[in-house]
């Protein structure tokens, strides 16, 4: 997959775990594909396919991330799971049944979700949890 032109990866999004960072890149790429489809006025099947791919990958990523935090014995995992559910619900709300059929979000609504929920989550939550895990591991090594 090509890097997203609409939502390019920036070094400030880096969590510090290559696997999680790669998954975050993929989320941005999928969001970029959906944005292009919606902005170009593509047909229902193309937009629905792009939307379904983003939802599926978001859910898979959140599950993988939660397993990682659980395996690392992060005390923040329950709070993180709740945030993941909220973000997923907000993503799902970008597609809804209107009186005349299925309605998808506007490009601006999608951009808002990506920038204010998804990317903000990378920076504010994921980086913080990973930082606390690595600092905790360093403290354990120095006290041993």
Model regions: which residues?
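Small-residue-biased structural context
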Residues: 1-144
